[in-house]
Amino acid sequence: MVAWRWACLICLAFSLTTLVQRGSGDTGGFRLEDAVEGTSSVKQRWDHVTTTTRRPGATRAPAKPAGPPAEDDFNLADALDDQNDRDHDRKKPSIGGGGFSDKDLEDIVGGGDYKPDKGKGGGQYGGGDNSDDSGMSAETGTIAGVASALAMALIGAVSSYISYQQKKFCFSIQQGLNADYVKGENLEAVVCEEPQVKYSALQTQSTEPPPPEPPRI
């Protein structure tokens, strides 16, 4: 127990002396600056030892400044510019048939009714003839569908009637055969019963006692 107390006192004294030395700013203490300087010097020596001369990279020629874009080149900025939608006093080449321009799109978005240009109804995508042809084809398809449905219903009704008549005919034949069989059985029963009646009549007659004879004088 005494030894344990002495050990505790020695540890406490050692810790107190360490704290006093740190508080007084002893030069022998640990400083972060010394560690940083030591690592930097080591790094410099390592770089000095391991550095090797490298082959200089190939120099690239400076890129030529891009000239003005050609008229045929596509530029996304042209699509965002509203002035490009105008004609700029240039006549656009005529395109065969009807077309859909930005003006038509603005009319639709603005709530106005779309009115195609006159004389442009015979193009690739528009025209009264195409609408008439589509209407006629739709009507023809509807009529064909109705006619096929009616034909299938009629065929089903005829086949059902034929099968019903066949079943009815088979049942009638079966009933006729059953009736003939019953009649035959009845005739056999009658024929078998007649001899029995005669035999029973003869048997009753034989069992009766003979009449008494009259007395003789």
From Swiss-Prot:
Residues 83-92 have a biased composition (Basic and acidic residues). Residues 50-64 have a biased composition (Low complexity). It is found in: Cell membrane; Cell junction; Secreted. Glycans are attached at S134. InterPro entries: CD99L2. Residues 26-141 are extracellular. Plays a role in a late step of leukocyte extravasation helping cells to overcome the endothelial basement membrane. Acts at the same site as, but independently of, PECAM1. Homophilic adhesion molecule, but these interactions may not be required for cell aggregation. This is CD99 antigen-like protein 2. It comes from Bos taurus (Bovine). The gene is CD99L2.
